[in-house]
């Protein structure tokens, strides 16, 4: 018998780059979504997904022709290019769910958050975020989408806090509040700062117009002392007190740190800090690809841990915390 062996010649770097340019980064987004659907997360908190939202800056290859990603480093005094990643992360299942990539100059974390919330398919989700996401618009968007939120706000004494004009006690509390948002400036509105909050035309709020001049916002505020400290933390949420106690609100917020740890793993363990591409669309492909790799790693680790070992001791994976 005569065997014909055909030599396989690998594609050149140029050919690979040209082939990548034909693929949209949305394909990778689709793959991530399908992966999460194929292996639905099973760790829930009282039936809810706990989803942290946060942002992280990512340095990318310098390109002076792209002003949206170009900025000057304050510490180093030189020009750099950077993306800002707005990410949602399932903290109980170690799973990336979504991301919105923005140029460093067009960064808008608040808008990115409510877009991510509205794109999430399940209503049984609690979105957890830090103080930079605490706006009336964020709260209204999440409520309108039928989801739940738990956001840390600046404390009652801060001049820029959402809570500053309410007559609140300087102690731990768990209270229901409501406020009417408006762009009108009548004497009646000005005389009732606890009932009304005036929004200037420069303040972004998407639910007031000429047909709907007012918007009533209902929410809950939980204030508690930090462990071993005299300082207070304040949390705003639309979660019911009948379903979630004050201590559970505190516990849920503390899970947010999982997303901070995930950024470290994504950038260094999954090597996102060393992208190969220079084109902005190709870099976004790599961002989604690293998230897919991250999720696959934790899905595999989760199944290994849950599998009953035949031997005496339980096997543990170094991938799981």
Show where each model-derived region lies.
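DNA-recognition alpha helix
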Residues: 1-9
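Glycine/small-residue-rich loop that forms an oxyanion/phosphate-binding "nest" at active or ligand-binding sites
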Residues: 32, 36-38
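Short, positively charged patches
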Residues: 69-72
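Conserved beta-strand elements of the Class I
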Residues: 49-51
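Single, function-defining residue in the core of a domain
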Residues: 1, 15-22, 27-31, 46-47, ...
């Amino acid at each position: 018998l005569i065997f014909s062996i055909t030599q396989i010649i690998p594609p050149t770097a140029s050919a690979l780059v040209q082939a990548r340019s034909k693929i949209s980064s949305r394909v990778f987004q689709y793959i991530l979504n399908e992966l999460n659907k194929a292996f639905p997360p099973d760790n829930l908190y009282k039936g809810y997904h706990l989803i942290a939202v946060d942002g992280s800056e990512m340095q990318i290859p310098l390109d002076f022709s792209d002003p949206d990603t170009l900025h000057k480093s304050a510490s180093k005094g030189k020009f750099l290019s950077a993306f800002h990643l707005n990410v949602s992360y399932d903290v109980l299942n170690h799973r990336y769910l979504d991301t919105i990539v923005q140029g460093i100059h067009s960064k808008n974390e608040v808008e990115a958050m409510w877009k991510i919330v509205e794109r999430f398919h399940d209503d049984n989700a609690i979105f957890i975020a830090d103080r930079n996401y605490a706006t009336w618009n964020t709260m209204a968007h999440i409520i309108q989408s039928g989801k739940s939120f738990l956001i840390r706000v600046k404390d009652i004494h801060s001049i820029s806090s959402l809570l500053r004009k309410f007559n609140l006690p300087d102690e731990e509390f768990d209270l229901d509040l409501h406020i009417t948002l408006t762009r009108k400036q009548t004497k009646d509105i000005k005389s009732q700062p606890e009932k009304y909050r005036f929004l200037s035309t420069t303040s972004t709020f998407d639910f007031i117009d000429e047909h709907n001049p007012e918007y009533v916002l209902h929410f809950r505020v939980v204030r508690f002392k930090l462990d071993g400290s005299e300082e207070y933390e304040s949390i705003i949420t639309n979660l019911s007190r009948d379903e979630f106690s004050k201590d559970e609100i505190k516990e849920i917020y503390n899970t947010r740190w999982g997303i901070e740890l995930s950024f470290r793993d994504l950038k260094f363990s999954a090597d996102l800090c060393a992208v190969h591409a220079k084109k902005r669309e190709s870099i976004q492909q790599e961002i989604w690809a690293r998230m897919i790799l991250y999720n696959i790693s934790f899905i595999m680790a989760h199944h290994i841990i849950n599998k009953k070992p035949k031997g005496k001791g339980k096997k543990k994976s170094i991938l799981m915390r």
